[in-house]
Amino acid sequence: MTNLIDLTFHELESLIVSLGEPPYRARQVWQWLWQKRCREIAGMTDVSKALRARLEEVAEIRWPVVEMVRESRDGTVKFLLALDDGERVECVLIPEKDHYTACLSTQVGCAMGCGFCATGMLGFRRNMTPGEMLGQVLVGRQYLTDKGVELGLRNLVFMGMGEPLLNYENLLKTLEALHHPQGLDFSGRRITVSTAGVARHLLDLGRTGLCSLAISLHAPTQAQRERIMPGAARLELDKLMDLLAQYPLKPRERLTFEYLLLAGVNDADADARELVRLLSRVKAKVNLIVFNATPGLPYSPPDEARVLAFQDILKSKGLTATLRKSKGSDIAAACGQLRAECDGEGEGEGK
């Protein structure tokens, strides 16, 4: 049976028309789904009983099921969500100064095989549907409402389980639904999609104007990247940078490059200088992330002095480089950790 939250607005409109109703009825149903977070068609009280009855014959509303919630001392909240087929994914609410950011998954598992990430250890299971991706936003907002939290869910980052651009069609439908003014009404400035670099849809995404882009880079050379991110090696760094140089940006906009610091792997002064050289070809800023030491993975975090020295080299060359503080380490908040823990398959670091 059709899950209404899987539908774009135009698909919902077509469904409503096929049931013999005028198209404007779709706006009413859409608002119930996204603004009022209605979970039963019968609860749409300003929709006619006849339409509700016909809708219930062909459709339903299915959110992901919250299987586990973990709350960190720093305010981070991690959800383990069960999908219709029993697969499980994760999403995270991250507290900021005046709002929350949700970190969303796009696939069950991942084919990229990054050596520092627990999701890669799971392998690729399947793509998530638009409703499954959007359902994470509904779950997050409902949690904050139920807790009476005053800070709202304002920003979305597609940096959870999976490679978003390998689920491009469903990602695009999700972004369109997020933008709809009579629904969740997120602006493109509030949405970031992170990719390891998939050539096929990279520029297509930029042309939509529906989000900002972040690149999961993590290494300044092709050889280093192949060692820690074997799946990303399909697109050579030089070719990736050539594509990114064509990526459509607003006048003051820059591409964000995520760089996970691994002791003795990619944190040397020479790595920092090579990173500056690599990024000189594009309008860039760097988000440095310190690896969280994790049993079962062959990596460790650099010490604070090494991290600051790396950052100082980038900044001295005129490159904006921020240091992202890890949150939720006490609740396995990095990508794939909670599912892997529950599956008994180990833990890892997110992108």
Curated annotation (Swiss-Prot):
This is Dual-specificity RNA methyltransferase RlmN. [4Fe-4S] cluster binds at residues 110, 114, 117. Coiled coil: none annotated. Residues 96-330 form the Radical SAM core domain. Disulfide bonds join 103-335. InterPro entries: Aldolase_TIM, Methyltransferase_A, RlmN_N, RNA_MTrfase_RlmN, rRNA_lsu_MTrfase_RlmN/Cfr, rSAM. Its EC number is 2.1.1.192. The gene is rlmN. The active site is at residues 90, 335. Belongs to the radical SAM superfamily. RlmN family. One of its GO terms (biological process) is tRNA methylation. GO terms for molecular function: 4 iron, 4 sulfur cluster binding; metal ion binding; rRNA (adenine(2503)-C2-)-methyltransferase activity; rRNA binding; tRNA (adenine(37)-C2)-methyltransferase activity; tRNA binding. Specifically methylates position 2 of adenine 2503 in 23S rRNA and position 2 of adenine 37 in tRNAs. m2A2503 modification seems to play a crucial role in the proofreading step occurring at the peptidyl transferase center and thus would serve to optimize ribosomal fidelity. Its main location: cytoplasm. S-adenosyl-L-methionine binds at residues 162-163, 194, 216-218, 292. Its cofactor is [4Fe-4S] cluster. Keywords: 4Fe-4S, Cytoplasm, Disulfide bond, Iron, Iron-sulfur, Metal-binding, Methyltransferase, rRNA processing, S-adenosyl-L-methionine, Transferase, tRNA processing. It is found in: Cytoplasm. The keyword tRNA processing applies. Pfam families: Radical_SAM (PF04055), RlmN_N (PF21016). HAMAP family: RNA_methyltr_RlmN. Reaction proceeds by a ping-pong mechanism involving intermediate methylation of a conserved cysteine residue. It comes from Solidesulfovibrio magneticus (strain ATCC 700980 / DSM 13731 / RS-1). One of its GO terms (cellular component) is cytoplasm.
